[in-house]
From Swiss-Prot:
InterPro entries: NADH-Q_OxRdtase_suN/2 (IPR010096), ND/Mrp_TM (IPR001750). It is an enzyme of class 7 (translocase). The chain crosses the membrane at residues 6-26, 40-60, 69-89, 106-125, 129-151, 164-184, 207-227, 239-259, 276-296, 302-322, 337-357, 380-400, 417-437, 464-484. It is found in: Cell inner membrane. One of its GO terms (cellular component) is plasma membrane. The gene is nuoN. It comes from Polaromonas naphthalenivorans (strain CJ2). This is NADH-quinone oxidoreductase subunit N. One of its GO terms (biological process) is ATP synthesis coupled electron transport. One of its GO terms (molecular function) is quinone binding. Keywords: Cell inner membrane, Cell membrane, Membrane, NAD, Quinone, Translocase, Transmembrane, Transmembrane helix, Transport, Ubiquinone. Its main location: membrane.
Length: 500
């Protein structure tokens, strides 16, 4: 018999599931091409689950359900809350774009987005290999369908096919690695796997063999080198509203899954996976920044930017354990979580501008499409400038403190190799600043092209959300301590559960 606590653990997921099905049914009777009722119900659902998750997080308790297959803890609850808010913002930005391209027909855009979020929730709360994998597959299958939503668009169809083939390969890697760990430890439960490895009664070679495949699968979901090949093509080929769905909230779910597997499950193997993360971080910083410099397509540039940002995120993850010492675990993983949250917030603002500048029959995807944006809309230009400055890591924007937190975690480790990595990361950030500042130069100093001279029109709700989104980049940069503390305390709950 399933106890009451188990049902409490999955209340938000049940609400999300029921509402996604209900919205699909309601949409059958909606005739409006802009799907106003479906849109309102989607926002209501996302707001409700965000409030539920925030209440769980503020409770500060950690408890398990369904035979330890699901965990509710502050880290997971906050990440699910922020994922819901991120998707809510995405839906607000994406609705005008999707309506102009007949993507709201049938209501699949909203329904698939909610089911993708359900998969993210399962990824974040899963404490069992099979549960994590099921959540991952639910999210990715919905993502494949969303990328291919414009069936008459050859570029989107090509992107969906690439995403599907490479995604299936990465899922196979991850599943094979998990099966190796199951064979070695005899358990699918993350806590039991941790205890089995810590007991040193399992062959190290078998564990490392499985670990390689797991890290490969996780790197694909994060978009880290050398498993980044899908990212630029999918970002560029997918409809921009879908690009933001893929590049926003799923990054938080991928971060949570990485913490669940590598920290909660495989922390005794830290010295092994840290070496892999270090190589991937270096590759991501180099390839991401150098490739972004050569791009003229804004979405493709932001895709390579994402790869470089994931390099910074990986640096935070590898700084948590130093020679088996977990003294800096909380600060390092807290800095990584803070980095993930601020990256998603900044990405939402940047892609929000691209979405709101697009109009029927025209995609504002080229950097030159932003020419003279300040003359047409100082608000849009200001938000985009803050996004670029934040991604570049310049004060007083929140991206500066995100990068600073990761660098402090590396330096405080006291390891020469980590200090070298910190210096290298700063150097690559200087290269990255070039292509971010190029966007600002185009907006403020170039004359608008003739096809960009039309006045910008966007729904009031989207403009309000955009203004708040941009303001948060500045406010959290001026006063980042509250969010930093929240991240550190969330990670502390994970560390305490491990007894390290």
């Amino acid at each position: 018999m399933i106890d009451k606590l188990s049902w409490i653990a999955v209340y938000p997921e049940l609400v999300l599931l029921v509402m996604a099905c209900l919205i699909a049914l309601v949409d059958l009777g909606v005739k409006s091409p802009r799907r106003t009722l479906t849109y309102a119900l989607t926002l209501l659902t996302l707001g409700a689950v965000a409030v539920m998750e925030a209440s769980y997080a503020l409770g500060g308790q950690t408890f398990y359900g369904f035979g330890n297959m699901v965990v509710v803890d502050p880290m997971g609850s906050w990440l699910k809350c922020f994922s819901s808010i991120a998707l809510m913002i995405t839906v607000v930005y994406g609705r005008p774009y999707a309506a102009d391209r007949d993507m709201l027909r049938g209501g699949e855009f909203f329904t698939l987005s909610l089911f993708a979020l359900l998969g993210m929730f399962v990824m974040i709360s899963g404490h069992n290999f099979l549960v994590l994998y099921m959540g991952l597959e639910l999210m990715t299958l919905c993502s494949y369908a969303l990328v291919a939503l414009r069936r008459d668009d050859a570029q989107a169809t090509e992107a969906a096919m690439k995403y599907f083939v490479l995604g299936a390969l990465a899922s196979g890697f991850l599943l094979y690695g998990l099966s190796m760990l199951y064979g070695a430890t005899g358990s699918l439960n993350i806590n039991e796997v941790f205890n089995a490895i810590a007991s040193r009664q399992v062959k190290h070679q078998v564990l490392v063999f499985g670990l390689v495949f797991i890290v490969a699968g996780l790197a694909f979901k994060l978009g880290a080198v050398p498993f980044h090949m899908w990212l630029p093509d999918v970002y560029q080929g997918a409809p921009t509203a879908v690009t933001l769905i893929i590049g926003g909230a799923p990054q938080l779910a991928a971060f949570a899954m990485t913490i669940r597997l590598l920290v909660e499950g495989l922390l005794p193997l830290a010295i092994d996976w840290q070496q892999m993360l270090a190589l991937m971080a270096i590759g991501s910083l180099v390839i991401g920044n150098l490739a972004a410099v050569a791009q003229t397509n804004l979405k493709r540039m932001l895709a390579f930017s994402t790869i470089s940002q994931m390099g910074f995120l990986l640096l935070g993850l590898l700084a948590g354990v130093v020679n088996g010492n977990q003294l800096h675990t909380e600060s390092a993983y807290g800095a990584a979580m803070f980095y993930a949250l601020t990256y998603v917030l900044t990405t939402l603002a940047a892609f929000g501008i691209i979405l709101l500048l697009a109009r029927a029959g025209h995609e504002s995807e080229e950097i030159t499409d932003l020419s003279g944006l300040n003359q047409r809309s100082p608000l849009y230009a200001g938000v985009m400038a803050m996004s670029m400055f934040s991604l570049a890591g310049l004060p007083p924007l929140v991206g500066f403190y995100a990068k600073l937190g990761v660098l402090q975690a590396l330096i405080s480790s006291g390891q020469t190799s980590y200090l070298v990595l910190a210096v290298f990361a700063v150097f690559m950030s200087l290269i990255g600043a070039f292509y971010y500042l190029r966007v600002i130069k185009v907006m403020y100093f170039d004359a608008p092209h003739s096809h960009n001279a039309q006045p910008i029109s966007a729904p009031a709700d989207a403009q309000i959300v955009l203004a708040i989104n941009g303001a948060l980049l500045l406010v959290l940069g001026i006063a980042p301590s509250s969010l930093m503390t929240l991240c550190a305390q969330s990670i502390n709950s994970i560390v305490n559960s491990l007894g390290v």
